[in-house]
Curated annotation (Swiss-Prot):
It comes from the Viruses. A motif (Nuclear export signal) lies at residues 40-47. Keywords: Cell cycle, Host nucleus, Virion. The keyword Cell cycle applies. One of its GO terms (cellular component) is virion component. This is Probable Vpr-like protein. The gene is tat. It comes from Caprine arthritis encephalitis virus (strain 63) (CAEV-63).
Length: 87
């Protein structure tokens, strides 16, 4: 018997970009309601400058891996509920 390796399906470049945005959005939604206020404000300040987006995303992923069972400490992580967004 010869076993065949599972075939990877072709991923269209537009789909790859969409998946990146969805993954970033999901990461933000999970962490923004769980991280302490100081960390959230630091991330928001870094995002305001615009060049630190990847660094913030990596820090969010690292925080998620270190604190997988972090409790929800704020009801929402949106711009209206977080004064650090400056909207």
């Amino acid at each position: 018997m010869s076993e065949r390796l599972p075939q990877r399906r072709e991923v269209h470049p537009e789909e790859r970009v969409r998946n990146i945005w969805e993954r970033e959005r999901d990461t933000w939604q999970w962490t923004s309601i769980r991280v302490p206020e100081e960390i959230l404000q630091r991330w928001l300040a870094m995002l305001r400058s615009g060049r630190n987006r990847n660094k913030v995303y990596r820090e969010m992923q690292k925080w998620m891996s270190i604190h997988p069972k972090a409790p929800v400490i704020r009801p929402c992580g949106c711009r209206l509920c977080n004064p650090g967004w400056e909207t």
